Curated annotation (Swiss-Prot):
Protein source organism: Streptococcus agalactiae serotype III (strain NEM316)
GO CC terms in record: cytosol
Phylogenetic classification of the source organism: Bacteria, Bacillati, Bacillota, Bacilli, Lactobacillales
Keywords (A to Z) from UniProt: ATP-binding, Cytoplasm, Glycolysis, Kinase, Nucleotide-binding, Transferase
GO MF terms, alphabetically ordered: ADP binding; ATP binding; phosphoglycerate kinase activity
Binding site for ATP: 208, 296, 327, 354-357
PROSITE patterns to which the protein is assigned, alphabetical: PGLYCERATE_KINASE
The enzyme's E.C. designation: 2.7.2.3
The name this protein goes by in its record: Phosphoglycerate kinase
HAMAP family, per database record: Phosphoglyc_kinase
Principal subcellular localisation of the protein: cytoplasm
Length: 398
């Protein structure tokens, strides 16, 4: 990566602005998954160990109007972070103004401050999400000319708290998490050790058209599962019962199949049910066709075996999207089967592209078996598509 990193700048005595991704799930004010906070710790610890004063920015959820602020404060995150760091985290509870400025100016070397949810600035004109120039300049003015972007999860967005600050500081650099995310995902796609197998699941072809096109050029095989299977099936005239289908993407699916040169591998059977919820019958299909009155909700046992065979000997695997409705035990065998097929390959570099796939690996107890699990679903998708990420492009060149 030809961008400056946090190790390339002198941090001692400096007020260092840091964009982290603390967009964690909260239930009744309690954090239910702290992975993103843990992922940011190496960069934060490095800054304070070097004598920097870390000023952290993050969003939490979506905030469009005043009422949306309820339950979206970063206060619980500040408490959790303090416990993880073993030191106080200053939390003024505001995004701008005298209270924030005084707290920042009172910081000493090695201390940490967390600014309130950056999206509170979206209430009046979407200043954060629309990269308001004045807001970016203001936040940049709170530091000493150094900005560290460690939020891969928002790197595909041009917001005031990443691109806006970057444009108004002397040096905008990558944190360790951002550096690792780019290294793992970009290197896997651009310079993979082969055979390189990509696995794409999820419900919609429309979400993955660009990714499939890019990976058909880069990968040796592209395995397709999840709900989008049935759009590919219908495009070939295969009966799909009541399964999910994107009627307006049938021509796209047909086109992808035609130009894939056999690289695109589809499931050969499904686990079908007579309803999505409240079903009374679940069974494996004989072949590709889904029965009338039924819908496919997972890949079937023959498909698991086929995908296992396709993954044999793989040296690089990128997986994005579950094979079925994995949250339901009746439809998680496909996702488990594919995960197990990936991790049993010797010497494989295995990467999960965030989102539902990451949740599946964590919930189904396979997370520690993968080389890398991305913290950013949308950002990793755009990297897999070969797109330039605004948050990364805005950083200072080496």
């Amino acid at each position: 990566m030809a961008k400056l990193t946090v190790k390339d700048v002198d941090l001692k005595g400096k007020k260092v602005l840091v964009r982290v991704d603390f967009n964690v799930p909260l239930k009744d004010g309690v954090i239910t998954n702290d992975n993103r906070i843990t992922a940011a710790l190496p960069t934060i610890k490095y800054i304070i160990e070097q004598g920097g004063r870390a000023i952290l920015f993050s969003h939490l959820g979506r905030v469009k109007e005043e009422a949306d602020k309820e339950g979206k404060s970063l206060a619980p995150v500040a408490a959790d972070l303090a416990a993880k760091l073993g030191q106080d985290v200053v939390f003024p509870g505001v995004t701008r103004g005298a209270k924030l400025e005084e707290a920042i100016n009172a910081l000493e070397d090695g201390q940490v401050l967390l600014v309130e949810n950056t999206r509170f600035e979206d209430v009046d004109g979407k200043k954060e999400s629309k990269n308001d120039e004045e807001l970016g300049k203001y936040w940049a003015s709170l530091g000493d000319g150094i900005f560290v972007n460690d939020a891969f999860g928002t790197a595909h967005r041009a917001h005031a708290s990443n691109v806006g600050i970057s444009a108004n500081v002397e040096k905008a650099v990558a944190g360790f998490l951002l550096e690792n995310e780019i290294a793992y995902i970009q290197e896997a796609v651009e310079t993979p050790e082969r055979p390189f197998v990509a696995i794409l699941g999820g419900s919609k072809v429309s979400d993955k058209i660009g990714v499939i096109e890019n990976l058909l050029e880069k990968a040796d095989k592209v395995l397709i599962g999840g709900g989008m299977t049935y759009t590919f099936y219908k495009a070939q005239g295969i009966e799909i019962g009541n399964s999910l289908v994107e009627e307006d993407k049938l021509d796209v699916a047909k086109d992808l199949l035609e130009k894939s040169n056999g690289k695109l591998i589809l499931p050969v059977d499904s686990k079908e049910a007579n309803a999505f919820a409240g079903y009374t019958e679940v069974r494996d299909t004989e072949g590709e066709a889904v029965s009338e009155g039924f819908l496919g909700l997972d890949i079937g046992p023959k498909s698991i075996a086929k995908f296992d065979e396709a993954l044999t000997g793989a040296k690089t695997v990128v997986w994005n999207g579950p094979m079925g409705v994995f949250e339901n035990p009746d439809f998680q065998a496909g996702t488990i089967g594919v995960m197990d097929a990936i991790v049993k390959q010797l010497g494989v570099k295995s990467i999960i592209g965030g989102g539902d796939s990451a949740a599946a690996a964590i919930n189904l107890g396979r997370a520690d078996k993968f080389s890398w699990i991305s913290t950013g679903g949308g950002a990793s998708m755009e990297l897999l598509e070969g797109k330039v990420l605004p948050g990364l492009a805005a950083l200072t060149e080496k």
